[in-house]
Each structure stands twice: as structure tokens, then as C-alpha cells.
Amino acid sequence: MAKEIKYDMDARDLLKKGVDELANAVKVTLGPKGRNVIIEKKFGAPHITKDGVTVAKEVELTCPFENMGAQLVKEVASKTNDNAGDGTTTATVLAQSIIGVGLKNVTAGANPMDLKRGIDKAVAKVVESIANQAEAVGDKFEKIEHVAKISANGDEAIGKLIAEAMQRVKTEGVITVEEAKGTETTVDVVEGMQFDRGYISPYFVTDTEKMECQMENPYILIYDKKISVLKDLLPILEPTVQSGRPLLIIAEDIDSEALATLVVNRLRGSLKICAVKAPGFGDRRKAMLEDIAVLTGGTVISEEKGLKLEGATMDMLGTAEKITVDKDTTTIVNGAGDKEAIQARIGQIKIQMENTTSDYDKEKLQERLAKMAGGVAVLYVGAPSEVEMKEKKDRVDDALHATRAAIEEGTVPGGGVAYIRAIDALEGMKGDNEDETTGIEIVKRAIEEPLRQIVANAGKEGAVIVQKVKEGKGDFGYNARKDCFENLCEAGVIDPAKVTRVALENAASIAGMFLTTECVIAEKKEETPAMPPMNPGMGGGMGGMM
């Protein structure tokens, strides 16, 4: 395939056009008065969103050179989304500003490599300033609520729900977002350990209204193979019946004959019992059974350990305060496991999480960790229409990521003020030469841009408000929602420090690459020749046929 090559100014100008096309589409969403973007979908209703990265991912331009520029900025948005989960629009605005001002200087004769060095030095200084401004969240859940509210575009209800979910599952818990069946947005928290396996037979149900099997203070038998004959279970069943306590069997499967005997005894009332299949598959199943054993103070009866079912004793059984089994899930509340053993197991899972490179494995380990340590919360997002539900789900996802980022690295004043306060750190900073100093000035100008854009989206004049915020100190800034100047931290306008940091680092990284580009190569579109017109004498059919 033939290639088309552009050099120098021609190349950079075309790339810049692509950058502006994408950034202008994304930046209208910034701030509390940012607008929505409607994205056409090939099937179904159009997608309405205020999420920067969702908008960025949809942009594809026809000119290959312009499209490359757009893809570079798309990389800024998606990298920021991967690392911090939010701040994608801010990162895009910063990248556009650094590229725009940087390009003017390169055109005027500045050395791109020196400019990049100056930009990198300035960014390091701003990152340091952001870290100094950050305040730890700790157990202050009102801060989490504020962060979630700001990320969800000022939606107080979402802020409250996320704060409630965080409070109940703690930092190690898992929070997932799902679409609700109705119009209400609710949070559902599962205390204790839950896994996605229900009863093997509905005849084990104790509460016929809810179709659940509820067991108080039960014994728990954990076996990693199939139970084929009932006589293997007798050493456990007889003492259990004498104790009068219920028994939960977790096994790979139970043979139909053994299951029928258990069900008959359960219906006669001589045996309080329930059986469920083991969760997970393969090695993950072994790990999850071990988790359940540690949590309940039991032992996994496994031939790998030299243990057989017929030789099982009551010491090998786990116990818990309460177990609820429905057709899809089993929930174990307050397992009687040793606290130190549980902590050791949690530590082990954390080490595995650090060592794994697969995102899928990391997610599954995080789920196991949550079940051991905190709990699992599900946020059900409801809305009157599907289009609104998708838009709301985007905002909830953003808010959730932002709150996690806030817990990691603390919070800074929102509304672009953290960047404005970082300008002081760059005052009087000089590079090794004139072009490096220009690079520092470029960053100094660029970090005003998020505030300018928030103000522009609110319909005000950016320069005037930026100047007034610069004259203030500390948390003093412009609250675009209320259209007033106030202490932003007290007003609850706060951003996660991690999001603020990652947005600038990614924007500067891609902008630096952009400015040091001298040649761009794209595939040349081949002109496909038009089909020749058909000869009128070449009609179908055979001559003389009627």
C-alpha cells in the first residue's frame, strides 16, 4: 500500500486540526454547567453522555493525518481514565492548550526538544505542589460524598449512595454498578461472604414465600469432589443429627441417588440440611473453597491433602452465625474463622494482586479480597428511559472511580483551583536555556485552561475570573454551579488529587511527543476506478426467446 508523507509545519498543522476537532467536542462537557454530547449508534437509540472519554472514543476523522492528531488526544483521555477513572475532559483540555501554545513557539523557531524538557520540569513541580495541597480523606465520609457528587455532575443523590456504599464495604470492599429494573437508584450491600451458587434442589427450601433456605448456627462441610454415595457422609451426618444443628454441604456435585436420600430425610424433618455446588472453576474453585474454609474455621476435605470424605470428623467442619441460600446465591454471615488466619489469607491475596499482570485475574482477586475483608455493594441505577439510564450510569461510574482515587491520594480544591495555586510553585523557575524556560511558561499558561473552560461553559468570561482566583489564597475559588466566589473545600467542591495529577502528567506526555514530531506517514487512499458503463446490447436472456 502506498504511503503519503508530510513534514514539518504541514504535518503538525494537520495533526493540530485533528487535536482541536476532538478536544472541542470533549471540552463542552467540563464543569457543573458543561453540556451533553449526543452520539449516534448504529443500532438503537443514540447515546447521550457527559463523560469525556466516551465522547473521545467515538471520534474518527476522514483525513488520516487529522485522525492521527485526534487519536493522540484520545490516548490522553483513555490513559487518564485507566489510571484515575476520571479527569478525562481536564486532561484533554490541558493537552490541547500545551499543544496549541507549544506549536506557536516551535513555528517561531524554538527547539522542540528543549521545550519538552522545560514542560517536563514544570509538570514535576506542579505535581509536587498538588501533593502538598492534598488532604487525606481518612474516615470522613462527607468528603467522599462531596467528591462523588462533583464527579456525578452535582447529583446529590448519587453522592449519598456512593458514600453509603463506601462506608458499609470499607476500602477493601467491591462496589459494582448495574442497571436497575425500575426508575429508582438504590444501593444493595451484601454483608458477609456471598458466592454465586444456589441450592441443588428446591426441596431444601425452609421459607417457601421467599424460596430461601435459612440456617442458624450451621455446620459447613467443604468437599472438592463429587459426592457419589451417601454412606461416605454418614460419619458427619450422624453426629450432626444428634447435635440438632443444620448442615450446609458445599461440594463439586452430588449424585442423584445421594441427593434423593438427603431430600427425603430433609422433608421428613429428621435432617436440617442444604447442599450447594462449589463456586468457580479449576484453580479458582480450589482457592475459593479455601477462602470459605478460612472464613468459617473449617477444612477443605481434599484428596490432595490426603483427606477422604469417609474419614472426615466434626473438627473439619466450619461454622457460621447464619447462612441464607436462594436459587442463585449463598451468603455466609459471620463465619467463625480465626481472625489471624483471615488476615493472613487477605495478605496472601493482596500479594497475588500485586504480582499478577492480567487485569481479569486482578479483578477476580479483588472480588475474593472483598468477600474476605469487607463486603460487596451493588449500585442499581434506575431512570425513566434507557437513554437516560445509560447517561446516569456513565456518571455513577465516574463518581465511583473518583471516590476511590480520593481515598488513595487525598483531595484538593476543585474547580481548577489546585492548578491555579500550583502556578506559585513555577514563579521564578528557570530552565537551562531560553527554550526550556519557554516550556515552563507554556505549562504555567496551560494549567489555567481547565478553570477558563469551566467558566466558559458557565457562560462567563474566563480571563476575568481566572485573575480574581489568582488574587485569592488557599481554597478560595469560583463555584460555577452557584456562580459565586467562596472557599471551595467548605462548599464541598473538591477533586481527588490523583485525578488532578494524572490528568496533567498524561496531557504533558502526549503533548511533548506531539511537539517533537517532524514527519508523519499515513496510508494513501487509492482511488478506486469507477465501474465502466454497461453496453446496452448486453442485456440478459437469449436472442429470439419470447
Curated annotation (Swiss-Prot):
Q: Main role?
A: Together with its co-chaperonin GroES, plays an essential role in assisting protein folding. The GroEL-GroES system forms a nano-cage that allows encapsulation of the non-native substrate proteins and provides a physical environment optimized to promote and accelerate protein folding.
Q: What is this protein called?
A: Chaperonin GroEL
- Residues annotated to bind ATP: T29, L30, G31, P32, K50, D86, G87, T88, T89, T90, G415, D495
Q: Which InterPro entries match?
A: Chaperonin_Cpn60_CS, Cpn60/GroEL, Cpn60/GroEL/TCP-1, GroEL-like_apical_dom_sf, GROEL-like_equatorial_sf, TCP-1-like_intermed_sf
Q: Which organism is it from?
A: Parabacteroides distasonis (strain ATCC 8503 / DSM 20701 / CIP 104284 / JCM 5825 / NCTC 11152)
Its localization reads:
Cytoplasm
Q: Which Pfam families match?
A: Cpn60_TCP1 (PF00118)
Per the record, the similarity remark reads: Belongs to the chaperonin (HSP60) family.
The UniProt subunit note reads as follows:
Forms a cylinder of 14 subunits composed of two heptameric rings stacked back-to-back. Interacts with the co-chaperonin GroES.
A molecular function GO annotation: isomerase activity
Enzyme class label: isomerase
What SUPFAM superfamilies is this protein classified in?
Answer: GroEL apical domain-like, GroEL equatorial domain-like, GroEL-intermediate domain like
- Indicate the principal place this protein occupies in or around the cell: cytoplasm
The superkingdom listed in its UniProt entry is: Bacteria
Q: Which GO terms describe its biological process?
A: protein refolding
Write out the catalysed reaction.
ATP + H2O + a folded polypeptide = ADP + phosphate + an unfolded polypeptide
Q: What is its EC number?
A: 5.6.1.7
Indicate the segments annotated as coiled coil, or none if absent. none
Q: Which UniProt keywords apply?
A: ATP-binding, Chaperone, Cytoplasm, Isomerase, Nucleotide-binding
One GO CC term on file: cytoplasm
